[in-house]
Amino acid sequence: MNMLALVAPVLGIVALLFAYSLSAKVSKQDAGTDRMKEIAAFIHEGAQAFLVAEYKILIVFVAVLFVGVGFGISWLTAVAFLLGALFSTVAGYCGMNVATKANVRTAAAAKDSGMNKALSIAFSGGAVMGMCVVGLGLLGCGIVWLVTGDSNVLSGFSLGASSIALFARVGGGIYTKAADVGADLVGKVETGIPEDDPRNPATIADNVGDNVGDVAGMGADLFESYVGSIVSAITLGAVTYSITGAVFPLLLAAVGIAAAIIGTFFVKGDENASPHKALKTGTYVSSAVVIVASLVMSRVFFGNFKAAFAIIFGLVVGVLIGIITEVYTSGDYRFVKKIALQSETGSATTVISGLAVGMHSTAVPVLLISVGIIGAYMADGLYGIALAAVGMLSTTGITVAVDAYGPIADNAGGIAEMSGLPRSVRNITDRLDAVGNTTAAMGKGFAIGSAALTALALFVSYAEAVKLFDTGIDLLNYKVIVGLFIGGMLPFFFSALTMDSVSKAAYKMIEEVRRQFRTIPGILEGTGKPDYTSCVAISTQAALHEMLVPGVLAVIAPMGVGILLGTAALGGLLAGSLVTGVLMALFMSNAGGAWDNAKKYIEEGNHGGKGSEAHRAAVVGDTVGDPFKDTSGPSINILIKLMTVVALVFAPVFLLVNAGMGLL
């Protein structure tokens, strides 16, 4: 049976080869005019410089944690941790590298060939990120399992993935939103120049941010969820069904890669049809393949359909959360239209209505996650919950592709604007970008849902490791109550840190843009050249400086509670952070997405269009929502997963401290 697990690394390699072929396809396309190439080079170099600087800092963090895991747990687990960190880094770097090539080629295709070709290039660029995530994730999990056969060592691989993911999400989120807020407030509100105008000194930093935040950061987030779901399913499967239960999640993930590759061939645009339909078709085809395959595999491996039903619950919940997110964040539905209407009376009512929509949007996804948990548990117990997480994430390859398509299309529009291409080109890139905003919002909803199930599955694995099933978590125990309070507080405190980081960085950016408008002659007339480099440097330095405290907090908090208060209190912390974290992430991501699309709805000519008072109010709402949806909200996903993985990996250490009762 264990030899069947060889299928996992083989399909991982297939995914990487497919990513390479897509990368080669993108690179062969025409990159457009000299001006387009020049702007694309600015974006590419800025993104590369940020990642290299970020990785230099991460080397120190990873080295310290490597030594801690080696001495505290085992050196084999430490090596797996190092492998997880390395694979997550490589996935982010490769995906972002291709995205910064695909953006200018998408703009060139829109200029020369029209919508269909532009969609194909943008999606292919995103698919490279998707295939790198699943390919390296499954390759790593497969290798570690085949070499060691130990789920405890495998949890080290998950810890490595989680560590990189947090810094990539937080650092990338701070970078992109510092630039975005600075560019919007000074450019649109104060000066009245359009988005992506080459006269705006922050516009290159804004476009760089799309790549480091929404491509590399998002990819690292889902890489962590993907790996974490597989690890938790293997851990619980080994306990429930021995070797069969451990190998099954690896094979399911392998089938998911094949399904994602098949789905990419169904993403075909039409000059007159909506690109959104093409992207949805690919996702639904992949999901259908996984459903059919899971029914067959469940019958063959277990002699029944219990595992398949759990997987299907996860898949369906993931798809439905994406649809619900679209309802709350798309300009086609009443919630966004209501915010746009409120913008007519000023920025205060815009912000109030957006907050209300964000809070409202938590209800249905939480109920869906709850139904998924109940259904998965009834189908196959605790193992079923872990399989539901694997099922939801089985099509990650195409989910990430659709999500990463968004920032590529956004960059293409920016390059078209800065290069002075005809309005017809911008019309095509605007259509692609509008779809990208919706898919990005849906992707964030999916990421939150998958984070909730993954964190829950990892929590169950932790409970198994410290024998909480024997004693239970006593809600009348004062230590557990303290753990719940601390856990419930952490997502709020973490969000405060990241929001404040964006605010401080945006302040510096705004001051720099204002300084350039004052001191560089002819900049607003188009005769003077802005200093793009200084704005890129501000975002880079701010992101690198501000990402450290939130990152360290996510590791220290569970370690401190586990050692001081014991394993039951740590269980309370994980439960508290899971509940408030999922709610905060949904609220912030959906409120931010709704504000963003309310602004775009007005820019289409509604409520006075661009330059109107309603538009100015909507820009303020969008600016408030930027760190909500692209920094704090997505980072909470990683916080709740990373703390659970830290608890799982260091469970043996906590058990040694006063027999798991803690020092206090």
Show where each model-derived region lies.
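Hydrophobic packing and interface segments
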Residues: 1-664
